[in-house]
Amino acid sequence: MSFSQESGTHHNSLDYAGVSDEEDEIDILGEDDPCSLKSHFYLQPTHSDMGDSGMLSPSKLSCTESESDSSGESEGGTSKDSPATSPGGKAKRALVKPPYSYIALITMAILQSPHKKLTLSGICDFISSKFPYYKDKFPAWQNSIRHNLSLNDCFIKIPREPGNPGKGNYWTLDPASEDMFDNGSFLRRRKRFKRHQQEFFKDGLMMYNSLPYYRPYSALQPQPMLQQTPLACMAIPETLSMPTNLTPYPDIKRKAHYPDQGAHRGFEGQDANNHPNKSQSKCSFSIENIMKKPKEPEPSFPSFNSHWNYNNHLLQRPSSCFLPAVLNLSTGPLLANVQGTRQYNLIKFPGSY
């Protein structure tokens, strides 16, 4: 007995017994139906304009909604077959960050260039063309490339040549950093490269205009210094003094008999210990000392005592190492011993403080 035949025997209402019989038949039919008819079928009053199936008509929309609810897609969000999320999700999963450090990426870019040197823009172009991840993230990582170039010793900055116009300097690899990566693999470095102090000196020579700075710094040879141990100071005996005002030899010979009164007063107070006279022990600022004509001291020539022990390396040095006033000691009495005084003018030589 089919469902349509059972519904045709009733006209306006159903008995309680009739309803129970129909529910038993619905259970039988629900065994093969993918929708659970017990929970989703419901009774509706029949109308004249409805067909035979209008009394107990399961809604297809309710069935499809039940399927979607049972799968958990209608309440949980969008379905797996949604075209909006699947292409975007697949595209994001495809852009995986490469397992290389920035130093490895820069090294790849420099090694593939014909001249083994590139600018910052050339390095960024190479990385963007080889790795889609960095192409999508550009220019967020450009500053990281710039910082790695300037902070790592394995990269050398080469200024542009005068006849090569353009923007930015070139960057190349240090020749001593070729074994920086383990077995040529860019995935792992052996150790951090450190440049030696001598190589720092060579790198500094490249910045001068008079040198071929466009060459690699390894081709430059350090210039030998003219004087390895410059003369700092020269030991002068205590008996050696030097006049304050340097004058030529004829003037010194002429003025030696007429010294200044101020210098004589300064020397007079210091010679009191060597010549204990009552006249010299008086105050140097008295009227008698000021009005009295000073004695004319005899000029004395420099006396080289036995305790003058000059080293051979000082005597063998060129004359340009000494002051011009000390060049000609034998030509005139430039240095005089003034009555054994111990107040001298210190001679400062180049390099002394």
From Swiss-Prot:
It holds the Pfam family Forkhead. Residues 97-191 bind DNA. GO terms for cellular component: nucleus. Residues 1-32, 48-92, 254-281 are annotated as: Disordered. Induction: By FGF-signaling. Inhibited by bmp-signaling. Residues 20-32 have a biased composition (Acidic residues). InterPro entries: Fork_head_dom, FOX_domain-containing, TF_fork_head_CS_1, TF_fork_head_CS_2, WH-like_DNA-bd_sf, WH_DNA-bd_sf. One of its GO terms (biological process) is negative regulation of DNA-templated transcription. Disulfide bonds: none annotated. Residues 73-82 have a biased composition (Low complexity). It is found in: Nucleus. Residues 271-281 have a biased composition (Polar residues). It comes from the Eukaryota. One of its GO terms (molecular function) is DNA-binding transcription factor activity. Keywords: Developmental protein, Differentiation, DNA-binding, Neurogenesis, Nucleus, Repressor, Transcription, Transcription regulation. Expression is initiated at the late blastula stage in the presumptive dorsal marginal zone, prior to blastopore lip formation. At the onset of gastrulation, expressed in the superficial layer of cells in the dorsal blastopore lip (Spemann organizer). In the open neural plate, expressed dynamically in a row of cells along the dorsal midline that are destined to become the floor plate of the neural tube. Only weakly expressed in the posterior region of the newly forming notochord. Transcriptional repressor. Controls the convergence and extension movements of medial neural plate precursors during gastrulation. PANTHER family: FORKHEAD BOX PROTEIN, FORKHEAD BOX PROTEIN D5. This is Forkhead box protein D5-B.
